[in-house]
Amino acid sequence: MKKFKRRLSLTLRGSQTIDESLSELAEQMTIEESSSKDNEPIVKNGRPPTSHSMHSFLHQYTGSFKKPPLRRPHSVIGGSLGSFMAMPRNGSRLDIVHENLKMGSDGESDQASGTSSDEVQSPTGVCLRNRIHRRISMEDLNKRLSLPADIRIPDGYLEKLQISSPPFDQPMSRRSRRASLSEIGFGKMETYIKLEKLGEGTYATVYKGRSKLTENLVALKEIRLEHEEGAPCTAIREVSLLKDLKHANIVTLHDIVHTDKSLTLVFEYLDKDLKQYMDDCGSIMSMHNVKLFLYQILRGLAYCHRRKVLHRDLKPQNLLINERGELKLADFGLARAKSVPTKTYSNEVVTLWYRPPDVLLGSSEYSTQIDMWGVGCIFFEMASGRPLFPGSTVEDELHLIFRLLGTPSQETWPGVSSNDEFKNYNFPKYKPQPLINHAPRLDSEGIELITKFLQYESKKRAPAEEAMKHVYFRSLGPRIHALPESVSIFSLKEIQLQKDPGFRNSSYPETGVFVINHFTCRS
């Protein structure tokens, strides 16, 4: 052992001490929490921690070098330390040079956690080839943290990041990302300025606000938390779904601020909803604009339905529109992720005028086609300027539906004759009326499409994905179907809003509309 200790001490002598080598290692590891105190040195006085054996200490810093050590007979020194002493040496240093390794020490490849860097150093001073970091730019940071392009970073943040951050080509842990976002200002109420109150509902109050990070307007949906009940289930649903829905035709959830008393959802701010847009047009919209809005509704729904998410509360008040004409689905408070097989859901889910007849008659098992009936009703309303089925009660709503589309029979709607609620109402035997008589501005292709939505049997309703390919949209051109999900249809030069014939204002007003708990709030 004396001979071994002497050889070990000679090996550890170099231009750098163990503390210096480990400090270099620490500089390249990901900082987990930006607000945490400085890490204590791993090694004190050049000795390994007493809780670890010499073998485990050496193995910690040499075991992941990827170059297997040469083996000597165990009788020379001993099996536990032979692998270390047998490694080739150049003078007093280990002859090891790190490449930009792609395999982490935990056995994972590029997906290795950002909390433990692959740039592991030997306790003896080892010069790394990639020690020098290139300067971090705003573009790097935006890409790294998925930030908005117009964000304003706090003064000095980039300089601090330059000193403390690991190389940007390494993976980043969720914990590190949260810490970085928090330091920038996300998740903090002081980042947002309340400008005015837009409205108040049962659980939430909505404010028009401004972000200090981007100087953009935002909608602050402040949900009150009751200590006895916690967050309303509608709020939990909305957050859990929206955080995973990233699409050009779905309202963007920018941030979540959680305090003891409230949960604030920070949304992008849009100027108005479809209901007010139609009101401003005097209920006479350009048929070209009707087509553009309908396509965007279908595009957003198709994205949701591919992910087994049902909106369940489609109505003009839940469709927000900005000055450019971009339409976005909003208010996912009643939305629900649909599992397979289909589960039973609440019977009270959709605003009465846009509720499909199967739900009105008590059906509680449904699929993505539940949303398509509402699409047909909204399509008609945009084209004609009036609601299709403005019933005041469930019976009145069904009466209006049957009077236009004909009272269903066992032939037109299998199973309806055995429905108890249908039998109890005892509706007159209405014959179907031609839809063109009620929506004369729709061409034959539009009538064909709306008929595909207004089917009694839910499984016969045209899915959103299929409807987008209908010949009715042929005039929009082929390129609109190839757009990435996050890209607006208005990025195409051939796609533009036209002036609506009945539009009463010469300029687009800033009205500030946002929807909470089925209550439309306007500034």
From Swiss-Prot:
Gene that encodes the chain: Cdk17
Question: Which classification does the entry list for the species?
Answer: Eukaryota, Metazoa, Chordata, Craniata, Vertebrata
Q: Where is the active site?
A: 313
UniProt-recorded name of the protein: Cyclin-dependent kinase 17
Which residues are recorded with the post-translational modification Phosphoserine?
A: 9, 80, 92, 105, 137, 146, 165, 180
Q: Which PANTHER family match?
A: CELL DIVISION PROTEIN KINASE (PTHR24056), CYCLIN-DEPENDENT KINASE 17 (PTHR24056:SF128)
Looking up PROSITE patterns in the UniProt record yields: PROTEIN_KINASE_ATP, PROTEIN_KINASE_DOM, PROTEIN_KINASE_ST
Q: In which tissues is it expressed?
A: Brain specific. Within the brain it is concentrated in the neuronal layers of the hippocampus and olfactory bulb, which mostly consist of post-mitotic neurons.
What SMART domains does its record include? S_TKc (SM00220)
For the biological process aspect of GO, one term held by this record is: regulation of cell cycle phase transition
Stored InterPro entries: CDK, Kinase-like_dom_sf, Prot_kinase_dom, Protein_kinase_ATP_BS, Ser/Thr_kinase_AS
Asked if the keyword Phosphoprotein belongs to this entry, the reply reads yes
State the similarity comment.
Belongs to the protein kinase superfamily. CMGC Ser/Thr protein kinase family. CDC2/CDKX subfamily.
Region spans: Disordered: 31-55, 103-123
Compositionally biased intervals (Polar residues): 110-123
Segments forming domain Protein kinase: 192-473
